[in-house]
Amino acid sequence: MNIHEYQGKDILRKFGVAVPKGIVAFSPEEAKQAAIQLFEEQNSPVVVIKAQIHAGGRGKAGGVKLAKSPEEVFDIAQQMLGITLVTHQTGPEGKEVRRLLVEEGMNIDKEFYVGITLDRSTSQNVLMVSTEGGMEIEKVAEETPEKLLKIQVNPLFGLQAFQARQAAFFLELEGEQFKNTVKFITALYNAYTSIDAAIAEINPLVVTKEGRVLALDAKINFDSNALFRHKDFLELRDISEEDPFEVEASKSNLNYVRLDGNVGCMVNGAGLAMGTMDMIQLAGGRPANFLDVGGGASPQTVEEGFKIILSDKNVKAILVNIFGGIVRCDRVAGGIIEAAKKVDLHLPVIVRLEGTNASIAQKMLDESGLNLIAAKGLHDAAKKVHEALEPA
């Protein structure tokens, strides 16, 4: 689960992670009042107005501005609130700006990158630091790997003091800056593990000319599987930032990810779903989604799956690929037939069912009288998808 920058900073602050003073605003007047408060409390001659959306690259897209007076903050907030911000992470559709973070300005001396996430290849947490603050870390790792240090952290022992010092040495810091960075990294790791985060990314981490070490930006993503331990975090979810199709699918406990293709997929099992998407691509189509209805696919979940797929106007054909192991194929076929009767299935639907009671399911589909195209095997299904996409 993703959250906004200001929410992430509020959480980090509770764990002793140094962050700038900031106030969230939902209107130009609130932004102005926040600026008045910050100018009174801070020594900085400027404040920063930052658009709050679930995407990076805001600065280049005009989502981060400096202001020297409350009146200027008001004007910038008027211009920024309600606009659609398009960055390299939002896609061409962009995201609407509904809230702003008004934050104290920093007298920046140096910028770095610090991030913590799970390294699945080693089953350990990995602390990453780079001298290239403000840059995309993937680009740094690819083009200048010598500027990125990765430190494996055994979750049984946690981050050791020497590892935090190793990271600070890599950043070539000395004196108070060194001590403050070690303290910062230690606090960040504590926060990361305590809140069951999937990633805690500070980009950039700044060192001011006064020696302060702070998180100028913060990206915190939670492990959704651990949210039962942090039910208060559910209040931080901003559904308006999420794909509406994915939100609707989650209500029916469907694992759905929207893509930009033209073939809708309905599959049971993540591995089979990935293989199905590959076959669609090889057959000349492009998958429009990842949709895993789970091992216990019922008529209700199949119907909801069809509704969600058909909501995507880019879909030109649908491939249903079910292996009947936990769930019987005849039960799935019944769900497909019932869903087809309730939902306006105006698109070609290719159905491939294998496993328990597959022959019974095949007979049910053949006798349904509906426009359902049966496929024998995955290759045949991919071939029929290709044929369905070809212009008449």
Curated annotation (Swiss-Prot):
- Residues forming the ATP-grasp domain are 9-248
Query: Bound how, and how many: what does the cofactor note say?
Result: Binds 1 Mg(2+) ion per subunit.
Please identify the protein, giving its name as recorded.
Answer: Succinate--CoA ligase [ADP-forming] subunit beta
Q: Name one GO molecular function term.
A: ATP binding
Q: Which cofactor does it need?
A: Mg(2+)
GO CC aspect terms: cytosol; succinate-CoA ligase complex
Q: Which gene encodes it?
A: sucC
Known InterPro entries for this protein?
ATP-grasp, ATP-grasp_succ-CoA_synth-type, ATP_grasp_subdomain_1, Succ-CoA_synthase_bsu_CS, SUCC_ACL_C, Succ_CoA_ligase-like_bsu, Succinyl-CoA_synth-like
Starting at the broadest rank, the lineage of the source organism is: Bacteria, Pseudomonadati, Chlorobiota, Chlorobiia, Chlorobiales
Its GO biological process terms? succinyl-CoA metabolic process; tricarboxylic acid cycle
Q: Any idea which positions bind Mg(2+)?
A: N203, D217
